[in-house]
Amino acid sequence: MQGIDVSKWQGTIDWKKVKASGVNFVIIRAGYGMNVDPRFYENYAGAKAAGLYVGAYWYSYALSRQAAEIEADCCKRTLAGKSFEMPIFYDIEEPNQLAKSAAFVSALITTFCTALEKAGYFAGLYMSRSPLQTKTTEDVRRRFAIWAAEYNTRLNYRGAVGMWQKSSSGKVYGINGNVDLDECFVDYPKIIKNGGFNGFSRGGNAAGGNSKNTPKQDAGTAPAATYYTVKKGDTLTAIAKRYKTTVSALVKANGIKDKNKIYEGQKIKIP
């Protein structure tokens, strides 16, 4: 599935032309630090009206867990009341972040993404291929959806990946100038709709801001939920062992009909 990612820097976009060009999805910058992207709401409305699958990303400047929590709160407020067929990604690429250890960077990612998961979002991580391999822990790479950037004819990343940003100089009908080009390898719209994430009620209907499954700005006293993203070769038995639970508990918590059938990219709730 072919897509693009955009921010205010693409200016005014003719989304009907973008859709007609063969683009299937778009990941829109919702904000950065504690700021909302000035064109986020405009881009969201236009992409939705054109029939594109829509996701979002939040560019991080966080240098502490507290700052990552604040960014997550800003992100949730910005996304509230909207539905997204694609994941919500945390964009980590600032040099002063990547100068830190893998444990430090992974703590930022886990803080932000867990906060989004508690609010009902399907969270993921955006990073360039090299720091993704050296500045994150295996637990982070296995737990969250991965969107890796590498401008090449192929992605030289050995781990499981859901999306690849393959160019920063693409040309797309309806957009003036360059735009990032992406390729998606996982059927996120199906997973997200069926799972009731990102503003959809379980089974695929948009919640419209009123369903109990709609992402909330404040998680209140609701218990924290942990999710695991299924990778190629995973089994429920292995996941159960990893999280010290049972296959039957996983089956019950996720409404799984056949314990022998799970698929790559699926979010498994850990009871």
Model-derived regions: residue spans:
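Glycine-rich, charge-decorated loop segments at or immediately adjacent to ligand/cofactor-binding or catalytic sites
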Residues: 67-70, 131-141
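Functionally critical loop-and-helix segments that line ligand-binding/catalytic clefts
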Residues: 1-10, 16, 20, 139-217
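Primarily a LysM-type cell-wall glycan-binding module
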Residues: 216-248, 266
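Aromatic-lined carbohydrate-recognition surfaces of secreted/lumenal glycan-active proteins
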Residues: 119-134
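Substrate-binding cleft of extracellular glycoside hydrolase catalytic domains
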Residues: 1-122
